[in-house]
Amino acid sequence: KDIYPHEERAFYSLACNHCEHPACVAACPVEAYTKREDGVVVHNPERCIGCKNCTRNCPYGAPRFNEETRKAEKCSMCYEDIDIGMNPACVNACPVGALSIIDLDADTVPDNVVQYPPGFPHMPQLNP
């Protein structure tokens, strides 16, 4: 068949995966990234020098370079909301309830959780 019309489509959130061993943290020469105890990887734009090392090294394309500010930016997992027991904005905004925050180290993980969906870079050393 031709490429169009698609018989099946899949949509993936390509926000930050907050990897266990994040490439962005390792690549940043000024430590603009920190990893919290809860696993959230936070970017500090005040420290960022705009070198783009994080954007080049993240296989998932999570950090993006903002041409206007000349600095990297990425999903913060809305850690301020998580700290007060709320969900991140993306979870609340998803119209079909497809997004959720899941602890992959928990004893029970829902059956429908897929860590490496088709087409997603397989990088077990980062443990997204």
Task: Map each language-model feature to its residues.
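Non-ligating segments of multi-cofactor redox enzymes
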Residues: 1-128
